[in-house]
Curated annotation (Swiss-Prot):
A GO cellular component entry from the record: small ribosomal subunit
Protein name as it appears in the record: Small ribosomal subunit protein uS14c
Organism: Buxus microphylla
GO biological process, one term: translation
Lineage of the species this protein comes from: Eukaryota, Viridiplantae, Streptophyta, Embryophyta, Tracheophyta
NCBIfam families linked to this entry: PRK08881.1
GO molecular function: rRNA binding; structural constituent of ribosome
Protein's cellular compartments: Plastid, Chloroplast
Length: 100
């Protein structure tokens, strides 16, 4: 189980990313439209003004039940070993164990 502080940090980053999403997107569009280099530098400075944790690359996908940051399946939002346990217990509809 992940520490609660790490899970809360991820939630805070998600909130910040949603808050500054429009600012980042509009600044990136402006950079592509402006022809002069000096104006691009000014807009780039604006792009750096939001907090670092508001960048979408700082977000990390975590397991829904345990908070584990690695080996997550996007479709289920679970880490590998929790997914396996839930499939064996028939808690995930439509998921079957493979056999060959």
């Amino acid at each position: 189980m992940a520490r609660k502080s790490l899970i809360q940090r991820e939630k805070k980053r998600k909130k910040l990313e949603q808050k500054y999403h429009l600012i980042r997107r509009s600044s990136k569009k402006e950079i592509s439209k402006v022809p002069s280099l000096s104006d691009k530098w000014e807009i780039h400075g604006k792009l750096q003004s939001p907090p670092r944790n508001s960048a979408p690359t700082r977000l990390h996908r975590r397991c829904f039940s345990t908070g584990r940051p690695r080996a997550n399946y996007r479709d289920f939002g679970l880490s590998g070993h929790i997914l396996r346990e839930m499939v064996h217990a028939c808690l995930l509809p439509g998921a079957t164990r493979s056999s060959w």
